[in-house]
């Protein structure tokens, strides 16, 4: 529903028959009411003009050419008039042809049909409201082969009845033919049947209309309350059955509350009037050679009208038409409407002559290429761009890299204002020429503009709020957006070709919201569960594992370091280093590699956590200067002759030294920030 004056909103829900009729019906100056589509025809095969009362009728949906009626008469369109003018001969309104994009029609069904979304989709709303098995309802609606003669009896207490029937029952054709005529005349039997007995969608509609939602909610709540008081029986199967019943009651209460809150009646889930979409949304196009290409919806609408008109003829001649034939025709109408709404939901879809399934209304609106995601949510907007994302591990968590070509387009208005404000350009044209020529000064101004201006990155589909996050942009070379890999968890993105959209917040309020609430380093936890979102990826974990890997032989295998030279194996003593810088310098000079075992002098507090607590060292070496070296599994201590500790060396690798240095620098930087 769209309100032009206040604001625009789109609400999807059930529409009443009166609302559907109000969408389509119009009253001509002659008093004739138009809007009902009664013929299955589209265009005349010779003139290619819309057929009267057909799916493209100009009286119902508006003129094909602005100001021209079906007769070919012309009258200037005056949108300022309060009342439109109509052609006296054909009844077509003299108005703009664009009304065919929103003017609707309707088909008056000869029998009520259930809306397949509310019957077959799980959970089935109709089955939940009526508290009946879905299989029984389907057999009632479609007259399935399993229960071909299933009817629903609803005696009305206020009126006299001769049959004490209530609920589902089966009948045979012979019983109707021989039993009831003994008590009723033909007209009396028809009146009795329409009052007491129903089948198909009519039976479901009557059941839904008889529901008192408040009473249903109160009774269901009392039943749930009684079950909740029961203690577990100890039998696993019985307890599961009771839990399923309780879950069903909770779903039923929620559904009834939704109907009461939205002021929607349950019987609206059964259609008596079928809306017909505007012609421009289901076009028929003529190509070269006179060939007509049509939307699948037109063929599905035609099938509905054909079957509905056949049912109308059967009902008009009901005295001579077998009851079973009427029931089968009602089923055909139900199946045609189901195929129009959601083709294939009940099994095999309806196909065309090329064995291709028809594209139904559900197929048009759902999915990535549907009306909502592609046409409504996927529209292009100003100050936005889109590109492939690539990994940028050197970037801070809150920064992203924007290509120069994209950044100059997104921030062009701000750059122009900067050029004119600094008197580097006389007017708008000069500023645009400078940008087009890519003069060096524009990159300096662009960096100044981007310095305090965050951007929003979005990856579709946006399933939660972390699908859109703010970043501080920087200029990079290339044509891809550079992103830190740790922020990919919130976007559910990876670097195998994923694309992301960039949006520039313009107002100060939007920029403040992006800076204080949406920056990526402030969204490290999931808002739903509280679990960390920024977690290391698999390639990070693999890199850390390789960086910190060591020889599994321990102290017994790395006392001496083997290396190969000309197919000969030599042994060098494991080197000693005094600091991180010495280790990294030796790595740069290729004296060692990341996996080389080394002894590193350690000046801090040593806390050793091992699986085996050793009271004595593995080995004690004595030197000539009365210095002893106590060698343990992961460290060694040098002591003087009095037992005082002179130095401490730990066994590690160059890769672990590099990793530990990065961790220490990050922690110290965080402490300085606070």
UniProtKB/Swiss-Prot annotation:
What does the Swiss-Prot or TrEMBL cofactor note state? Binds 1 Mg(2+) ion per subunit.
Which cofactors, by name? Answer: Mg(2+); Zn(2+)
GO BP: DNA-templated transcription
Q: Which residues form the signal peptide?
A: none
Give any GO molecular function from the UniProt entry.
DNA binding
InterPro entries assigned to the protein according to its UniProt record, in alphabetical order: DNA-dir_RpoC_beta_prime, RNA_pol_asu, RNA_pol_N, RNA_pol_Rpb1_1, RNA_pol_Rpb1_3, RNA_pol_Rpb1_3_sf, RNA_pol_Rpb1_clamp_domain, RNApol_RpoC1
**One Pfam assignment:** RNA_pol_Rpb1_3
Question: What keywords tag this UniProt record?
Answer: Chloroplast, DNA-directed RNA polymerase, Magnesium, Metal-binding, Nucleotidyltransferase, Plastid, Transcription, Transferase, Zinc
Q: Which GO terms describe its cellular component?
A: chloroplast; DNA-directed RNA polymerase complex; mitochondrion
* Binding residue positions for Mg(2+): 494, 496, 498
The residues listed in the UniProt record as binding Zn(2+), with positions renumbered to this chain, are 69, 71, 87, 90
- Provide the protein's localization: Plastid, Chloroplast
Q: Enzyme group, top EC level?
A: transferase
From the UniProt record, list the reaction(s) this protein catalyses: RNA(n) + a ribonucleoside 5'-triphosphate = RNA(n+1) + diphosphate
* Enzyme Commission no: 2.7.7.6
Q: Which family does it belong to?
A: Belongs to the RNA polymerase beta' chain family. RpoC1 subfamily.
Sum up the protein's function in the record's words: DNA-dependent RNA polymerase catalyzes the transcription of DNA into RNA using the four ribonucleoside triphosphates as substrates.
Q: How does it assemble?
A: In plastids the minimal PEP RNA polymerase catalytic core is composed of four subunits: alpha, beta, beta', and beta''. When a (nuclear-encoded) sigma factor is associated with the core the holoenzyme is formed, which can initiate transcription.
Q: What is this protein called?
A: DNA-directed RNA polymerase subunit beta'
Native organism is Psilotum nudum (Whisk fern)
Question: Highest lineage ranks of the organism?
Answer: Eukaryota, Viridiplantae, Streptophyta, Embryophyta, Tracheophyta
